[in-house]
Regions:
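Hydrophobic h-region of N-terminal signal peptides that target proteins for export
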Residues: 10-18
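Positively charged n-region of N-terminal signal peptides that target proteins for export
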Residues: 1-4
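Short, surface-exposed interaction patches in beta-rich subdomains
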Residues: 156-158, 173-185, 189-291
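Acidic (Asp/Glu) and glycine-rich low-complexity loops/linkers
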Residues: 6, 18-129, 135-149, 153-166, ...
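Beta-strand-rich extracellular passenger or scaffold domains
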Residues: 108-115, 134-135, 192, 211, ...
């Protein structure tokens, strides 16, 4: 009986301690990037001074590792050293980060990020994988490269000179910005909604990717294969080159010229009064005007 009571008391104390939250602040060197995975829920704020703090259960706090290497802030949870009971009862760890400049974001696992404030790095790199959720990012940069994979959901606004997006898996990406040159590569069952203006737009998608564009570009190149869908009816371009294969579907709005190579069971639908420059169709492919 005493052993049972002792065991129950120990269990009660352990559960009670799991419910206690503590806040910890960390003294770290200057950083301009963030790397986090697992179950970190990050609130990012633009500030003139850098700071980092976490809020978590008291027993879990000792397993949180915060470090900076080559200007990259790393948030990590040492699950290898954690007792099994802690692993089973671990909830999201809240992290509060303030920084003056942001040029890199690498998130994985089930990490979350909510950002406020605009950042102006010369270059920006973003990598979001797993089941990441990131929104509120406002980036203004000369050069940018963003990769989104898995079941991640990412929202980015701002202004870029040259920007490249690679989306895959079942990821969902929402973009709102101006750019000089935008490149998008999509595969799997990924989805993207883009709103903005660009001088040059190059979109290449495959699989069951779905991309919707709103805004305008001077020149554009659209390539779609598999069962992908590219809806650019409300994305007005002057001149466009199009290549469609498989059973892909492309909608476009053109004021200047269209050059197109359409094959398989793919369909090209267009709005506007463009000049048909170089047109090739084969198999069951078709070109139709949007009425």
């Amino acid at each position: 009986m005493k052993k049972i009571l002792t065991l129950l008391l120990s269990l009660f104390v352990s559960v009670l301690m799991l419910g206690q939250e503590i806040n910890r602040s960390y003294q770290v060197p200057l950083f301009t990037g963030i790397e986090a995975g697992g179950i970190f829920d990050i609130t990012l704020t633009k500030s003139s001074q850098n700071s980092v703090s976490t809020t978590s259960n008291k027993e879990i706090a000792k397993y949180i590792n915060v470090s900076v290497k080559n200007g990259l802030l790393k948030l990590d949870l040492d699950t290898d050293s954690m007792p099994a009971m802690l692993k089973r009862n671990t909830k999201y760890i809240k992290a509060q980060i303030a920084m003056n400049q942001l040029d890199r974001v690498y998130l994985s696992g089930a990490a979350k990020l909510k950002s406020s404030g605009a950042f102006y790095p010369a270059t920006f790199r973003g990598d979001f994988s797993g089941a990441v959720i990131a929104d509120g990012l406002v980036i203004n940069s000369e050069e940018s490269s963003v990769q989104v994979s898995g079941a991640s959901k990412v929202e980015i606004k701002g202004k870029f000179k040259n920007v490249k997006y690679d989306i895959s898996g079942a990821s969902v990406v929402t973009i709102e910005h101006e750019s000089t040159d935008i490149k998008v590569g999509g595969s799997g069952a990924s989805k993207m909604e883009y709103t903005g203006t660009s001088t040059i737009a190059n979109i290449s998608i495959s699989g069951a990717t779905n991309v919707k564009l709103k805004g305008s570009a001077t020149t554009a190149s659209f390539e779609a294969s598999g069962a992908s869908q590219l809806d650019a009816e409300y994305f007005i371009v002057r001149d466009v080159e199009i290549e469609a294969s498989g059973v892909s579907n492309i909608r476009t709005n053109v004021t200047g010229t269209i050059s197109a190579e359409i094959s398989g069971g793919s369909v090209l639908r267009y709005a506007g009064n463009p000049t048909m420059k170089n047109i090739e169709t084969s198999s069951q492919a078709s070109i139709q005007r949007i009425k």
